[in-house]
Amino acid sequence: LLFPASLALAALFLFQASNMGVADYVIELGKDQGYSIGYLSNLLTVANVVAISGALLVYFLGTRFGRAVPILIGTLIAGSFTFLFHWSQIESLFFVANAITGVTWAFTVPYLLGLCATFDEHGRVVVFAGFISKMGLASGPLIGAMVVGDGNFTTIINLATTGLLLCGALAIWAEVSAKKFADR
């Protein structure tokens, strides 16, 4: 099960790096659009409170639909709303992009960690997943710093969107591969 576990870990890394790559620069993106720090602080506070609902969805859904379906839905929505940051000059879209990407973050990560937990009985993969998750969280802003420069937000938005969609594909591949290994 090393191959599917590696795919799941790569998916987790991409999800965290992609989200954090944009999240780390969202205030700068907002300032670039002419929003004040006070406005951005209030907007992001409300968006983060809304984001809590993602974790509540996990609580209510559990594994009723498995892990692959919620991960796929979460990454598709996250990718779509990350792409929406291209229209950050429209206040309502900027808010919705922040809120919904926050919801998908709180929703998808538990399923990715749960997927990692399915690959061994002793919990080694999921323990390593904690490390991989943190590496993704640290790498996103690093990559962002290399590409944003003087307001080049388009590149980080596109990279993050691509990373999120690739995350979904890797997670599905991991689940399908794990089932093939289990059937042997």
Describe each region flagged by the PLM:
Residues 48-56, 137-138:
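Residue-level signature of mid-helix packing/kink "hotspots" within the transmembrane helices
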Residues 4-45:
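Extracytoplasmic gate region of multi-pass secondary transporters
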Residues 119-153, 160:
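A late C-terminal transmembrane helix in Major Facilitator Superfamily
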Residues 66-112:
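C-terminal transmembrane helical hairpin of 12-TM major facilitator-type secondary transporters
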Residues 42-51, 101, 129, 133:
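Transmembrane alpha-helical segments of major facilitator superfamily
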Residues 158-184:
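Multi-pass alpha-helical transporter architecture, strongest
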Residues 54-67, 148:
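Helix-to-loop junctions at the C-terminal end of transmembrane segments
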Residues 52, 72, 76-80, 161-168:
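Small-residue-rich packing faces within the transmembrane alpha-helices of Major Facilitator Superfamily
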